[in-house]
Swiss-Prot record:
Keywords: Aminoacyl-tRNA synthetase, ATP-binding, Cytoplasm, Ligase, Nucleotide-binding, Protein biosynthesis. NCBIfam families: PRK09194.1 (NF006625), proS_fam_II (TIGR00409). It comes from Chromobacterium violaceum (strain ATCC 12472 / DSM 30191 / JCM 1249 / CCUG 213 / NBRC 12614 / NCIMB 9131 / NCTC 9757 / MK). This is Proline--tRNA ligase. GO terms for molecular function: aminoacyl-tRNA deacylase activity; ATP binding; proline-tRNA ligase activity. One of its GO terms (biological process) is prolyl-tRNA aminoacylation. Its main location: cytoplasm.
Length: 568
């Protein structure tokens, strides 16, 4: 491609409303243009990257036995009503009526539609297994779209759905997709982790997220550097401290703590170690009763773990201030298990503590020297906290570390959640109807671009991996419109690279060198060759990788092989 025939539109500054680096750079480099909140036009340079991502995904899905379909963006309400998601989905599901007053929705996902197709088309066990996928536009009416394409309302997603005759076969389909996802993200050239995850609103009981590692990531990824253990923060297990609980050595004493409402204030007031304090959180049980949950002062309650405890409302609901006063006779900041007659749930770490400091269920009062079994009943014990860096790994192979990540893919084993709700069955070997065992597998195609940039950029612009760069190589002739020698050398290298199947751009716009280089550093082309009169007189041209601080002089007659070696 010649730049004079392409569309290049770069900006020196990003709009003031751009939130994060990837959004700023994509707008400045002319990859996207905003049309409305969370809705963007894909410009030619950005669309090239999208198409390359789609190609890699499509190749690996086909390799894994996926069958491509295209499902409607507009979906009838009746299917969503069958699963109950028409009401449960909330405002993110954009609903509308057609001219006949029939209800429809713009698809945020396609479980209902594909399950409807399966129940009509896959009638026998002989038709299984099947795995259908699409790469299609989705729409979720986010309350506060932000971060550019990372959390837009309209986006492109690859979603796949597997149908199997048994849970065992569904597990094989899951493993097949997990392996395909690893190949996809390996080929995309991104640093990522596959982590065990909570199934969330999708449902099911087996799930992995694929997280691109980036300091700006929203998600905390927990892993063990010396083993294969990895999970997101919601699911990572906090191992109980080793050994038995120490014996009580202090008497229970009530201490006046005026205006102390937080753990930090308590530690400062009493001049104690935060690890000797216990934090009290009140949540609602299934019967709307107050349930007291306890974590160590320096730990945080894990809401996903907490709502999975039997008898606790799911999703988790925190008790109101009025309900807390009714149950404890005190306000938040002064609560504890001593004297409380309701249900008490302690984290594993708290259950091993002795002589701890806790609220006394009187405003501005705390207990020191509190102990389970002596001063209050033994609590129920569950893992209900977030892990922290340095915690022992659940597999016993070392200590945990935490990185930030951006979720770009997710695989779920659904079981019969949707097939049972929609009466989607097949006939087994005995001629009896059975619901399909299902899995669903998503990749945020356009989200990948934002994640890749958040992982790969510098103060000059983006740095694309070779596999998804808009152009792998850019040839930058200095004086293309003035020097016949430069034009001849640039045209020859351009033609030779094209003949070798290289995705190359020849910048023949006649821009000043500084402006030309700045454009391609912003756009992030990984390999650049600069050709100028001065160098050619010495038989040299310059090669520079986007990550290199300096260019390298290369013999003009060797530059083709040099570039090809860098692309290998």
């Amino acid at each position: 491609m010649r730049a004079s025939q392409f569309f290049i539109s770069t900006l020196k500054e990003a709009p003031a409303d751009a939130d994060i680096t990837s959004q700023k750079l994509m707008i400045r480099a002319g990859f996207i243009r905003k049309q409305a909140a969370g809705i963007y036009s894909w410009m030619p340079m950005g669309l090239r990257v999208v198409r390359k991502v789609e190609t890699i995904i499509r190749e690996e899905m086909n390799r894994a036995g996926g069958i491509e379909v295209s499902l409607p963006v507009v979906q009838p309400a009746e299917l969503w009503q069958e699963t109950g998601r028409w009401d449960a989905m909330g405002a993110e599901l954009l609903r509308f009526k057609d001219r006949h007053e029939r209800d429809f929705a713009l698809q945020p996902t396609a479980e209902e539609v594909i399950t409807d197709i399966a129940r009509r088309e896959l009638r026998s066990y002989r038709a299984l297994p099947k795995n259908f996928y699409q790469i299609q536009t989705k729409f979720r009416d986010e309350r506060r779209p932000r971060f550019g394409v990372m959390r837009g309302r309209e986006f492109t997603m690859k979603d796949a759905y597997s149908f199997d005759r048994s849970a065992e076969d569904a597990g094989k389909s899951y493993d097949n997709m997990y392996a395909a996802y690893r190949r996809i993200f390996d080929r995309l050239g991104l640093t990522y982790r596959a982590v065990a995850a909570d199934t969330g609103a999708i449902g099911g009981d087996r799930s992995h997220e694929f997280q691109v590692i980036a300091d700006t990531g929203e998600d905390a990824i927990v892993y063990c550097p010396t083993s294969e253990y990895a999970a997101n923060i919601e699911l990572a297990e906090a191992v109980a401290p080793a050994g038995e609980r120490p014996a009580a050595s202090a008497a229970l004493a009530k201490v006046h703590t005026p205006k102390v409402k937080t753990i930090a204030e308590l530690v400062d007031f009493l001049k104690i170690d935060i690890k000797q304090t216990v934090k009290a959180v009140v949540v609602e049980g299934e019967q709307d009763e107050a349930v007291l949950m306890l974590v160590r002062g320096d730990h945080e309650l894990n809401e996903v773990k907490a709502q999975k405890v039997a008898g606790i409302k799911n999703p988790l609901a925190f008790a109101s201030p009025a309900a807390i006063r009714d149950a404890f006779g005190a306000n938040p900041g002064s609560l504890g298990p001593v004297g409380f007659k309701g249900r008490v749930i302690a984290d594993r770490t708290v259950a091993k503590m002795a002589d701890f400091v806790i609220g006394a269920n009187e405003d501005d009062q705390h207990y020191t020297g509190a102990n389970f079994g002596r001063d209050c009943a033994e609590p129920e014990v569950f893992d209900i906290r977030n892990v922290v860096e340095g915690d022992p790994s659940p597999d016993g192979q070392g200590a945990l570390a935490i990185q930030r990540g951006i979720e770009v893919g997710h695989v779920f084993y659904l079981g019969t959640k949707y097939s049972a709700a929609m009466n989607a069955t097949f006939l087994d070997e005995d001629g009896k109807p059975k619901p399909f065992e299902m899995g669903c597998y998503g990749i945020g195609v356009t989200r990948i671009l934002g994640a890749a940039i958040e992982q790969n950029y510098d103060d000059k612009g983006m740095i694309w991996p070779d596999s998804i760069a808009p152009f792998a190589v850019v040839v930058c002739p200095v004086g293309y419109d003035r020097s016949e020698a430069v034009k001849e050398a640039a045209d020859k290298l351009y033609a030779d690279l094209q003949a070798r199947g290289v995705d190359v751009m020849l910048d023949d716009r006649g821009e000043r060198p500084g402006a030309m280089f700045a454009d391609w550093e912003l756009i992030g082309a990984p390999h650049r060759v600069t050709i100028g009169d001065r160098g050619l007189k010495e038989g040299k041209v310059e090669y520079q990788h986007r990550r290199d601080s300096e260019a390298t002089a290369v013999a003009a007659d060797a530059i083709l092989e040099h570039v090809l070696s860098k692309l290998a």
